[in-house]
Amino acid sequence: MFFKKYFLKEKIKQNSYFIWNNENKNIQIIKKFKLLDLDLIIGVDSQKEILLKNTINFAKGNFSNNALLWGARGNGKSSLIKSVFHNVLSKNKNLKLIQLNKNNMFDIEYIYSILGQYEEYRFIIFIDDLSFEKIDSDYKIIKST
């Protein structure tokens, strides 16, 4: 157990982009992270500014809100999140991003318990392609955590 915790600590310390691996219940490093320059994302200037300020506040430990971006598929929501994160990361090395697939939302409490051991870092959990259907109640797990 000591070695697992030590290696996880080193992995978190040395990297910033991760994805949750449901099979081994651990985070995996994302080595190639597709990024757009924040200035190339156009047409959503007010949303970009709000998300940027909120992420800066979060990285500094100040008041911030959870963020939910919605819109049609392919409109750049994921690109905006990744670009804002990368922009804020350049000045706040304590910031980390963990991508979580919708199918792994039930692991969120377990993920929180792991990340809670690393108080020196600020973790953004990014759930990509989250959709809500009338018969889908899976999202309720994130409401209560």
Residue ranges and their predicted role:
Residues 1-29:
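Interdomain "pre-motor" coupling segment immediately N-terminal to P-loop NTPase/helicase cores
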Residues 26-50:
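Dynamic helix-loop-helix/coil hinge segments at AAA+ ATPase domain boundaries and subdomain interfaces
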Residues 30-32, 56-64:
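Phosphate-binding P-loop
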Residues 41, 87-122, 129-135:
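AAA+/P-loop NTPase substrate/partner-engagement loops
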Residues 46-60:
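Pre-Walker A adenine-sensing motif
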Residues 61-81:
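Walker A/P-loop nucleotide-binding motif
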Residues 82-86:
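A conserved segment at the C-terminal end of the G1
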Residues 136-145:
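Substrate-gripping "pore-loop 1 plus following alpha2 helix"
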